[in-house]
């Protein structure tokens, strides 16, 4: 029984590691970090081949197959949590506030965020509309700053795949 449990734990560990790396590699590719994704794939495929050979040599036990499946699920979850912590890339926030908060754009610029603003028209009157570009790892900071200055702001976050130009582009890209 001890060797079965030990074998199951090895399979789970290998699969968690493999799938976590796969998830991170996939996200790196989406973010345009092809070199890092390529380097990571070497380690990923090595671990995959090790795990696959172990499971194929031991298909006689349902515990091994269950361990493989459980490791896969945990690996996806763990990989997505790691990516969330890394917060790679940029976010674009569309912020809409009542016009009395016109100073918000200047406050956000002073905090190092890229802001373009213009006047818009809402259902109940004029609104200040802002597009705010920030690194994704500053998203919580941006939202906290907006909330502290204007708690009833309407905010939508998006992830731009590419952008170019603008006075702030050199600062953002490097």
From Swiss-Prot:
Q: Which cysteines are joined by disulfide bonds?
A: none
Locations listed in the record = Cell membrane
Transmembrane stretches in the record are: 4-24, 35-55, 59-79
Q: Which UniProt keywords apply?
A: Cell membrane, Membrane, Transmembrane, Transmembrane helix
What's the domain of life for this entry? Bacteria
A single GO CC term for this protein reads: plasma membrane
Chief location bin: membrane
In its keyword annotation, does this UniProt entry include Ion transport? Answer: no
Family, per the entry?
Belongs to the UPF0316 family.
Task: Give the protein's recorded name.
Answer: UPF0316 protein DSY1893
Supply the source organism for this entry.
Answer: Desulfitobacterium hafniense (strain Y51)
